[in-house]
Amino acid sequence: MKRLLLAVLLCCAGAFSAANARTPFQARCEDSIGATITALTARDAGYSINNTLSTMALTRMKPQVHANRFVLGLTRTEARMSIKLSAQVLGDPASGHECIAPQVEVALSYAPIVIYVGSQFEPGTCAYGEVLAHEMRHLKAYLDHLPKVEMAVRAALKKRFANQPLYAPAGQGKALLEQEINTGWMPYIKKQMGDVERLQAAIDSPQEYARLSKVCKGEVQSLIESHKRNRE
């Protein structure tokens, strides 16, 4: 994550004092303004299974599908995040600075996950079970990734804010914090959430497509060939 604005939005009181002494402003700030607080929540919203769309419809729903492949099943969701910022501010006219005790609340979630299995596959059949099992791997990747993002973001927040007030030129503290969140934290968290797509792509490997084409005594392959003929 880009470390922006730190030259202006100071994260340590040492900029205002000698190595081992607090200035009166530092003492007043640190003793009275309150604690810096960061809070993070992460949750998934569950999943559902949809068996109403054909493999051709699912293929159209998925971008960048190889021309010779059909999408037999599809797992869809959307990463969501929100960051709320509030702050207590204490000014010091003598120095022309202010100290800020931010409260940062981060919420991470996925939209309800929908697992699609092509309507050509009847529930209870071997082919349906194989396609569903493949999609459940995608579901697991999403559900396993969210706690990892939570852990990484929580550690980064703790390191950045360290339960210490921040210092800035008078009247600029909150605006600088908002800028840091918008240009630093939001892209950082978005990337962390988006890293799961590399895992999803690895699940849809050529080897996995080849395996699925051979399962259930060729039942899946016969459906694929039928749809290829219909497309031509």
Stretches with model-predicted labels:
Residues T23-G34, T38-D44:
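N-terminal membrane-targeting hydrophobic helices
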Residues S109-E122, C126, P147-E150:
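Sequence context surrounding c-type heme c attachment/ligation sites in exported
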Residues S17-A21:
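Boundary at the C-terminal end of the N-terminal hydrophobic targeting segment
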Residues M1-L4:
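Positively charged n-region of N-terminal signal peptides that target proteins for export
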Residues M136-V153:
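Catalytic Zn2+-binding segment of zinc metalloproteases
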Residues I37-A39, R43-A45, I49-A107, I113-S119, ...:
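Metalloprotease/metallohydrolase-associated module, dominated by Zn2+-dependent proteases
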Residues T125-E130, L139:
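Active-site alpha-helix of zinc metalloproteases
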Residues L6-A15:
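Bacterial N-terminal signal peptides
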